[in-house]
Curated annotation (Swiss-Prot):
Name of the protein in question: Transcriptional repressor NrdR
Cofactor, free-text remark: Binds 1 zinc ion.
InterPro entries for the chain: ATP-cone_dom, NrdR-like_N, RNR_NrdR-like
Zn finger residue spans: unnamed: 3-34
TM ranges: none
GO biological process, one term: negative regulation of DNA-templated transcription
Length: 156
């Protein structure tokens, strides 16, 4: 495995274990050249999933793009990278379990919002603001108000 710090090809596996949800193997590695430690994940590749965009063009599902989007929404929030990884794993498992090889970007966005809603309400609102293309402060206010009323209803 190539070291992300010095690009050396030789690294040694220091620890290997399955992830919490059992969908991957997490490996802690140490570069034999610079000594840096890094983590890799090994996953089973089920099938190629295609995302149908709003303009009808198709592109391969990009797990790292979804992780980036969720990470941006969760920035400076009490959400760990492991929680983000679990959320994305859950979404990907649901897509694969559906048996379909294609999913609309709309459905993918909805699934992501569903997961974020239970994870962190601020991250949920941040993601929704981009996904739903809020154009005015009022859009934020209305959405935040609806989220607040749902949270209060759940608490009662």
């Amino acid at each position: 495995m190539r070291c992300p710090f010095c690009s050396c090809e030789n690294s040694q596996v220091k620890d290997s274990r399955p992830t919490e949800d059992g969908t991957a193997i997490r490996r802690r590695r140490q570069c034999e050249e610079c000594g840096a430690r890094f983590t890799t994940f090994e996953r089973i590749h089920m099938r190629d999933i295609v995302v149908i965009k709003k303009d009808d063009h198709r592109q391969p599902f990009d797990r790292s793009k979804l992780i980036r989007s969720v990470s941006i929404a969760c920035r400076k929030r009490p959400v760990s990278p492991d929680q983000i990884e679990l959320l994305v794993n859950s979404i990907q498992q649901k897509i694969e379990a559906s048996g379909e090889s294609e999913i609309t970007a709309v459905r993918l966005g909805e699934m992501t919002m569903e997961g974020l809603r239970t994870l962190d309400s601020v991250a949920y609102i941040r993601f929704a603001s981009v996904y739903k293309d809020f154009t005015e402060a009022r859009d934020f206010e209305d959405f935040a108000r609806s989220v607040r009323s749902v949270i209060e209803a759940v608490k009662e």
